[in-house]
């Protein structure tokens, strides 16, 4: 056991750490939520992680994305994630896929090779495609709902999509998942009423703490599932 994971081992035991080391997790979207998912998975000792994102780091990401720094602006998010992961755990197997996961390229990726899948994508069409395909190969998946226009991290919850409320993205997903035959879906969502900025800009407002908290909650659900808690 690497010394860097000794304190985690005290929680999960040697068997749990071995399960984490042997796990392969896919994270789709490494922005405000997904970046924190990756961070916590790497620091928990997950042995293999694949990340999928086609975006580059922008200065406007610095307020909430853990990979966004002055010296990473302009870099591919997946590459920044890879370099950061290797700094945390040089032994990790980390694959960076620079792409937007969409229905027209979904056949390129074999989801059955993953222990767990995290959906931190913004686009409804892509989310539905990923979720449906994960369900088709019986790979557990957890999906992030909206974290923009929110300030209360304490109002984040883990629930089935059918039991969500207040979240506009979750409302859309509840409606659309029926068309895809998706009966169950674990999500992290916020019960907080969205705070809509009083201007003409439709870009969601964001804080440093709500997306990050959502990502850490998701990572916790994944880790607990892998070790059998």
Indicate residue ranges for each PLM-predicted region:
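N-terminal charged helix/coil linker that caps or initiates catalytic domains
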Residues: 1-25
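Glycine-rich phosphate/adenylate-binding loop
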Residues: 2, 109-116, 121-129, 133-137, ...
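Conserved N-terminal Rossmann-fold NAD(P)-binding element of oxidoreductases
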Residues: 27-29, 52
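Hydrophobic/small residue at the entry helix of a nucleotide-binding pocket
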Residues: 33-34
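Conserved S-adenosyl-L-methionine
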Residues: 42-48, 136
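Glycine-rich phosphate-binding loop and adjoining beta1-alpha1-beta2 segment
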Residues: 46, 51-89
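Conserved SAM/SAH-binding loop
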Residues: 97-106
């Amino acid at each position: 056991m690497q010394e860097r994971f000794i304190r985690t081992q005290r929680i999960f035991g040697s068997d749990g750490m071995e399960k984490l080391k042997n796990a392969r997790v896919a994270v789709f979207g490494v922005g405000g939520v997904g970046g924190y998912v990756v961070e916590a998975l790497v620091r928990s000792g997950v042995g293999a992680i694949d990340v999928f994102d086609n975006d580059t780091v922008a200065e406007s990401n610095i307020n909430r994305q853990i990979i966004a720094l002055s010296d990473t602006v302009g870099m591919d998010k997946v590459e920044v994630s890879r370099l950061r992961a290797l700094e945390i755990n040089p032994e990790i197997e980390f694959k960076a896929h620079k792409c937007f996961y969409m229905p027209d390229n979904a056949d390129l990726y074999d989801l059955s090779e993953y222990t767990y899948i995290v959906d931190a994508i913004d686009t409804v069409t892509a989310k539905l495609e990923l979720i449906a395909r994960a369900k088709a190969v019986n790979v557990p998946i957890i999906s992030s709902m909206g974290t923009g226009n929110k300030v209360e991290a304490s109002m984040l919850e883990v629930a089935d999509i059918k039991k969500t409320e207040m979240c506009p993205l979750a409302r859309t997903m509840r409606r659309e998942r029926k068309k895809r035959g998706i009966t169950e879906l674990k999500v992290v969502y916020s019960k907080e009423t969205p705070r809509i900025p009083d201007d003409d800009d439709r870009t969601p407002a964001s804080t440093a703490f709500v997306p990050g908290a959502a990502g850490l909650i998701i990572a916790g659900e994944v880790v607990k599932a892998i070790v059998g808690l």
